[in-house]
């Protein structure tokens, strides 16, 4: 039985030791390579120095660094805060460049108009006749019609010449005005005469219609986005990426590639994503696509507007002008021709669509065709809409599509275009009114890099590549392979180390300064390897933040005059303080846990989920953070509570430690609390005596005894107290008195002291007896329960004593063995030394015997 008890005792000891050693605590790591999706404002940088872009963006320092990461991330070009932000920002740049700024409320009057159809001209007749033919006309730089401005097929718009009366500078007199309008911009009613109609402007009552203050140029501008310090940009580096990929290899970059701000429908111009291949970004839920065209085919577009234009101002009311243009044969017209191998480029687009995993239509290339929208659509959808040097061109692409698709009918590699003043906004619903085209020749050249289209197929027989007017799709292609993330350098993980326990120092590694991007260089490493470099990581993070802050401050200082009144200037200044706020927020959070300025901070908080533990050798910090993100709120609360309790304990400890210093005993401020307490006790005793005196006096008054109102000698009257109630020893009469030693005299005030003492004594006796009875009853009740609990401690004491006796016996045996071995060794050594010492004597004795 004793052996069983010993085994049980040893088992309990091992279990308790294992339970203590196997317990994990929350450890806070600062500087881990982890992140989460973000949607903060970005700021832009550009190389332009001579355009309006310099007042919108900061100067570009050409710092484009890229680091490959061995991890995966989900990307979606359409569910992307960066592309949405780019759409809004480009619209802001667009509005800043050619923004209408004067409300156009006049001209909401009845106008008498004469319809002047331009189809009666010779050119239009020739053009109409040519529409019925199927000839092919191709232009190049050497074509004579380009130099003479006589290329056939430039259609003429239907124009209406109108007259109206409005009050001018003299409010009591009306003035007659003349103006020329496009037919589609007016709503007309039949007049009294056959050639006369009553017309109104369609959009005269729309409050958002405005007139431009001044004529501006819309120059080509390229800029790139930059992430504020504390944030990073991830780019999908997979050639199979098509706008959506849940697992994509990626890299970390400090800022985006250059992005083009060109706005247009149908085609994208001067894009930065053109490669030596054709690829498609396809929306994850519908048929919206943006197709990047192969740069091998050198697809370009050249637009030209003939000169000799005249703009006439019309003063409608005092201080407000409306600019008009006299009617002529070709009002507000231009034309664009296309160069490059368009036929093979569109053929490659069809092949790419056929091989795309999202496509399930016909595989016959001849049944996949490039189509346009119906004629009832908006002008920006029905025509190719683009901006050329600040003018809005609407180009009829019918001849061009016939040429590319090799259809029947007139085939031309150029399109006729018209310049409009009333333009539908592409970012929001509304219209703007701009000045008429400037005088002189207008031309612009662009590289065609993408095609905006909806791919529709109903069955396996026909597929339409319908060109689209979604301008925002251009920025899905430009920036759809990026995503913005916020660096989350604070992480939690369970370790067996508790706060204030000794830790084996780690070998320090050399710090390689990689800049801010080097912070994420270990994102693909295992947690154990990444945690070894947390000191370097956190220093790199702070150094990168400070460096980027300094660079941003420098460029803002250089541009502060230009940035004073711009919206983008405000955004750039806002980005300056984003990172430092984030860093201070992280440090404040670490400070609330008692981990300020520590890379690895062990705590006393037990790990909340023992079944969830990291694989330090195979798991990255990003993977671990995804698993424990739902525990962050609980862990944060526990850490804050533990830190509050720790601060309370430290405060109490400091209060006790202050008496360790001998000089503190003579500090008057240290004794003030005790002096105050002593005064309170004295005052309490005095008040208690007064209260007892009053109570005693009232009690005596109720009995009819009133010593208070007696004469002063009554205060000293004696109260006889018998010493012995038996018969007095001396027989004396009552008159003669007796032995004075048999009585004691007490002042009556003493009884006031005896009364509270007796009451206090009775109260203490009652409390003592009650507590003793309660403890006795409790002990008797718990006796059966405590009896089994005495055995384990008894076994433990027995085991400890047995273990001590065994150790003592082993020590005695070892001591005796060592002593015996020492005595034996000493004897052997002594005999050996004696023999060695006797050698000379033996030699001498031998020599003497030999001589004898």
Swiss-Prot record:
Give me the Cytoplasmic side stretches, as residue ranges.
699-852
So what does this one do? Answer: The surface protein gp120 (SU) attaches the virus to the host lymphoid cell by binding to the primary receptor CD4. This interaction induces a structural rearrangement creating a high affinity binding site for a chemokine coreceptor like CXCR4 and/or CCR5. This peculiar 2 stage receptor-interaction strategy allows gp120 to maintain the highly conserved coreceptor-binding site in a cryptic conformation, protected from neutralizing antibodies. Since CD4 also displays a binding site for the disulfide-isomerase P4HB/PDI, a P4HB/PDI-CD4-CXCR4-gp120 complex may form.
SUPFAM superfamilies listed in its UniProt record: gp120 core (SSF56502), Virus ectodomain (SSF58069)
- Which residue intervals make up region (V2)? 162-204
Question: In its UniProt entry, what is this protein called?
Answer: Envelope glycoprotein gp160
> Where does the record place the region MPER?
655-676
- Positions of the UniProt region annotated as V1: 113-161
Which portions of the sequence form the region Fusion peptide?
Answer: 510-530
Extracellular side, ranges: 25-677
Q: What cellular component terms from Gene Ontology apply here?
A: host cell endosome membrane; host cell plasma membrane; membrane; viral envelope; virion membrane
What does its PTM field state?
Specific enzymatic cleavages in vivo yield mature proteins. Envelope glycoproteins are synthesized as an inactive precursor that is heavily N-glycosylated and processed likely by host cell furin in the Golgi to yield the mature SU and TM proteins. The cleavage site between SU and TM requires the minimal sequence [KR]-X-[KR]-R.
In residue numbers, the region (Immunosuppression) covers: 573-589
Disulfide pattern = 44-57, 101-213, 108-204, 113-162, 236-248, 303-336, 388-444, 395-417
Q: Which GO terms describe its molecular function?
A: structural molecule activity
Biological-process GO terms, alphabetical: clathrin-dependent endocytosis of virus by host cell; fusion of virus membrane with host endosome membrane; symbiont-mediated suppression of host innate immune response; symbiont-mediated-mediated suppression of host tetherin activity; virion attachment to host cell
- Positions of the UniProt region annotated as Disordered: 713-740
Glycosylation positions?
37, 70, 114, 148, 195, 205, 237, 247, 270, 276, 287, 298, 341, 364, 396, 406, 445, 461, 464, 609, 618, 634
Task: Region V3: list its residue ranges.
Answer: 303-335
Annotated site, Cleavage, chain positions? 509-510
Leftover remarks: Some HIV-2 isolates have been described that can infect cells independently of CD4, using CXCR4 as primary receptor. These isolates may have an exposed coreceptor binding site.
Q: What InterPro entries does the annotation carry?
A: Gp120_core_sf, GP41-like, HIV1_Gp120
Give the residue ranges of motif YXXV motif: 705-708
């Amino acid at each position: 039985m004793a052996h069983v008890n010993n085994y049980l005792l040893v088992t309990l000891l091992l279990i308790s030791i294992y339970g203590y050693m196997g317990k994990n605590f929350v450890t806070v790591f600062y500087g881990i390579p982890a992140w989460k999706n973000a949607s903060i404002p970005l700021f832009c940088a550009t190389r332009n120095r001579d355009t309006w872009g310099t007042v919108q963006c900061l100067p570009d320092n050409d710092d484009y660094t890229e680091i490959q990461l061995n991890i995966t991330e989900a990307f979606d070009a359409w569910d992307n805060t960066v592309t949405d932000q780019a759409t809004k920002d480009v619209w802001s740049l667009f509005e800043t460049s050619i923004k209408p700024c004067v409300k156009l409320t006049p001209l909401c009057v009845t106008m008498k108009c004469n319809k002047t159809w331009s189809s009666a001209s010779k050119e239009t007749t020739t053009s109409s006749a040519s529409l019925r033919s199927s000839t092919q006309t191709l232009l190049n730089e050497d074509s004579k019609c380009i130099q003479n401005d006589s290329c056939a097929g430039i259609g003429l718009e239907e124009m209406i010449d109108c007259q109206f009366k409005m009050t001018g500078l003299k409010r009591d007199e009306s003035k007659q005005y003349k103006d020329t309008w496009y037919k589609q911009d007016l709503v007309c009613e039949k007049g009294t005469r056959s050639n006369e109609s009553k017309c109104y402007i369609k959009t005269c009552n729309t409050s958002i219609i405005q007139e431009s203050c001044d004529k501006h140029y819309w120059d080509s501008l390229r800029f790139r986005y930059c992430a504020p310090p504390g944030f990073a940009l991830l780019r999908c580096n997979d050639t199979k990426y098509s706008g959506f990929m849940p697992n994509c290899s990626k890299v970390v970059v400090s800022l985006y590639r250059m992005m083009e701000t060109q706005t247009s429908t149908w085609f994208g111009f001067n894009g930065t994503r053109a490669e030596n291949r054709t690829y498609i970004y396809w929306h994850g839920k519908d048929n919206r696509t943006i197709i990047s065209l192969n740069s091998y085919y050198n697809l370009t577009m050249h637009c030209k507007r003939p000169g000799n234009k005249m703009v006439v101002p019309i003063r409608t009311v005092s201080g407000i002008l409306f600019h008009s243009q006299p009617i002529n044969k070709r009002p507000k017209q231009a034309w664009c021709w296309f160069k490059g191998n368009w036929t093979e480029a569109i053929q490659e687009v069809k092949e790419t669509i056929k091989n795309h995993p999202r496509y399930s239509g016909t595989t016959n290339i001849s049944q996949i065709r490039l189509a346009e929208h119906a004629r009832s659509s908006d002008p920006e959808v029905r025509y190719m809409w683009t901006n050329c040097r600040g003018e809005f061109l609407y180009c009829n692409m019918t001849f061009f599509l016939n040429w590319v698709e090799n259809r029947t009918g007139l085939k031309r590699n150029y399109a006729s275009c018209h310049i409009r003043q009333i333009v539908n906004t592409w970012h929001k619903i509304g219209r703007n009114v701009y000045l008429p085209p400037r005088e002189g020749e207008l031309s612009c050249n662009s590289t065609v890099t993408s095609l905006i289209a909806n791919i529709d197929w109903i069955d396996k027989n026909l597929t339409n590549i319908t060109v689209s007017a979604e301008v925002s799709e251009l920025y899905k292609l430009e920036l759809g392979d990026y995503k913005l993330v916020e660096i989350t350098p604070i992480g939690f993980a369970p370790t067996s180390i508790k706060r204030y326990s000794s830790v084996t120092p780690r070998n320090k590694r050399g710090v390689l300064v990689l800049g801010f991007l080097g912070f994420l260089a270990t994102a693909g490493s295992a947690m154990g390897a990444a945690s070894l470099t947390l000191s370097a990581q956190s220093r790199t993070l702070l150094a990168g933040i400070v460096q980027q802050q300094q660079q941003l401050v420098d460029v803002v200082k250089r541009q502060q005059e230009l940035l004073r009144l711009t919206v983008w200037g405000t955004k750039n200044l806002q980005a300056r303080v984003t990172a430092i706020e984030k860093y201070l927020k992280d440090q404040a959070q670490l400070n609330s846990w008692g981990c300020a300025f520590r890379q690895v901070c062990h705590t006393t908080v037990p790990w909340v989920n023992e079944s969830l533990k990291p694989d330090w050798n195979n798991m990255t910090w990003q993977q671990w953070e995804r698993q424990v993100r739902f525990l962050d709120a609980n862990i944060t609360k526990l850490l804050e509570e533990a830190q509050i309790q720790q601060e309370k304990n430290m405060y109490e400890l400091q209060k006790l430690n202050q008496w360790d210093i001998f000089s503190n005993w003579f500090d008057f401020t240290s004794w003030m609390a005790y002096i105050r307490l002593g005064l309170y006790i004295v005052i309490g005793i005095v008040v208690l005596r007064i209260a007892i005196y009053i109570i005693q006096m009232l009690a005596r008054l109720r009995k009819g005894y009133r010593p208070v109102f007696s004469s002063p000698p009554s205060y000293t009257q004696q109260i006889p107290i018998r010493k012995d109630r038996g018969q007095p020893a001396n027989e004396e009469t009552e008159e003669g008195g007796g032995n004075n030693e048999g009585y004691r005299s007490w002042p009556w005030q003493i009884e006031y002291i005896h009364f509270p003492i007796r009451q206090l004594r009775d109260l203490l006796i009652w409390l003592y007896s009650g507590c003793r009875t309660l403890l006795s009853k409790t002990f008797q009740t718990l006796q059966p329960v405590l009896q089994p609990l005495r055995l384990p401690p008894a076994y433990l004491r027995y085991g400890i004593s047995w273990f001590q006796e065994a150790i003592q016996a082993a020590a005695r045996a070892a001591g005796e063995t060592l002593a015996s071995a020492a005595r034996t060794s000493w004897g052997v050594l002594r005999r050996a030394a004696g023999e060695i010492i006797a050698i000379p004597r033996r030699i001498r004795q031998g020599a003497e015997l030999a001589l004898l």
